[in-house]
Amino acid sequence: FKRNKDIHFDIYYKIVNISRDTIFYSKCKVPDTTDGRLEILLLHLIILIRKLKRDRKEYLSQSIVDLMFSSIDLSFREEGVGDLSIPKKMKKVGMVFYGRSASLEDILDTEDELNKKSLLIDYFLRNAFSSDTSYKKNAEELSKYAIAFVGLVENISISEISRLDIQAIK
């Protein structure tokens, strides 16, 4: 018997597992580094949190964000980052998260689909590929995926999120 308030764990770890899918690092060529993995995790979390806010589930979205920060903090500690360096690193992660959130939500709220796709390509080039234009095709793949993932997430209930399957949109 699972308590309803524990759903944020199920949702967060489902998103973590989706973000580890090799498609992002092989087909889309996102660097398989800490920063690259963080970009893909944030992509999924921001889209999910956007849905939760629209569904008026702010408490659940905040619980997921809190869990993400706790998980990243723990990862730093497990990597041997010193206690004095953790706050500075976490501040940077927070700035990245809230900056990406604002940017990505603005892009996803764009009504013109061609403009949205173009903005997403620029977003991914800048953030996932360090503005290296030789990755434009990969940024295009990520933008198509992001739009498909938004469609997938928007059309399911909260209870279905922990069973999300991205196979159909890869």
Language model segments and positions:
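Surface/interface-facing alpha-helical segments and adjacent flexible terminal/loop regions used
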Residues: F1-K170
